[in-house]
Amino acid sequence: MGKGGALSDGVIKKILLSYTYVAIWIFLSFTVIVYNKYILDKKMYNWPFPITLTMIHMAFCSSLAVILIKVFKIVEPVSMSRDTYIRSVVPIGALYSLSLWLSNSAYIYLSVSFIQMLKALMPVAVYSIGVLLKKESFKSETMTNMLSISFGVAIAAYGEAKFDTWGVMLQLGAVAFEATRLVLIQILLTSKGINLNPITSLYYVAPCCLVFLFFPWIFVELPILRETSSFHFDFVIFGTNSVCAFALNLAVFLLVGKTSALTMNVAGVVKDWLLIAFSWSVIKDTVTPLNLFGYGLAFLGVAYYNHCKLQALKAKDAQKKVQQGDEEEAGKLLEERESEAAAKRNETED
């Protein structure tokens, strides 16, 4: 094959690799969600201890992150002072622990399909909190789109066959804490030039989460676990569940590193629809036509929001390229003038 053929082969390999990363991420994300539901649901494995499950994940993930960074040196740790850690990482760790605790708790009360529908509110929460914290500028067009997403989720909630108020409150709380965490990452870390990939995030944040979760665990779940004499720690169940949770973080690292965050958003939409289909067909959760209509409306709003973000990123990149081109042209002109001035000086000396 010629040069063009070799180039085509390279492009095809890159596309296939990207699709492979997407498929791995969807599979692992799907597996972790269904596995957590299986463990926590009283009708399945019947182990309704979301704080303990989250702590097991955090202990396992932080241990492996330390091994990957300190022993195998797969990624370099970020240089961070104690003051920066306390001011920036600790608040993010607190929010992350609350988000995981509440989202895992919701699996006890709500179906997998309905939880995915409620998660469609994430862009609404991120944008609203971003505006409140002056990280995002208020735009009436964007806010109208956010309202359409909220309206779609409200319709889906109205059509939910097994609506549980407490479960909905837990999931909405998880969305609010997660959205605040995402905005604070931009304010406290990204703005300071600190970029954490999923592995370094676990290295710094997971131990912090473990500490924050320990205090509610002592009062909420530990007394019940002590009374449950029949309970024995199943290393196969909790071990494989923790491995899946850590593998998911590695998959995020690969997906964002080799493709883009937008690809992950699109893959997330595919995963949500697959989970809804799985919840309905395998777990036998009830999915009503009103559920699907409401979620479909919210889905269109989220898709439009992602499209607008992509266009904004493209415009920003194009502007950067124009600025770089102008700077290069100005540099060339300056070099030419300096060369001309040097030539004139040489002529005068001669």
Curated annotation (Swiss-Prot):
It is a multi-pass membrane protein. Residues 324-350 are annotated as: Disordered. It comes from the Eukaryota. Keywords: Membrane, Sugar transport, Transmembrane, Transmembrane helix, Transport. Pfam families: TPT. GO terms for cellular component: endosome; Golgi apparatus; Golgi trans cisterna; plasma membrane; trans-Golgi network. It is found in: Membrane. The chain crosses the membrane at residues 15-35, 49-69, 89-109, 112-132, 146-166, 168-188, 205-225, 235-255, 263-283, 286-306. This is Probable sugar phosphate/phosphate translocator At4g32390. It comes from Arabidopsis thaliana.
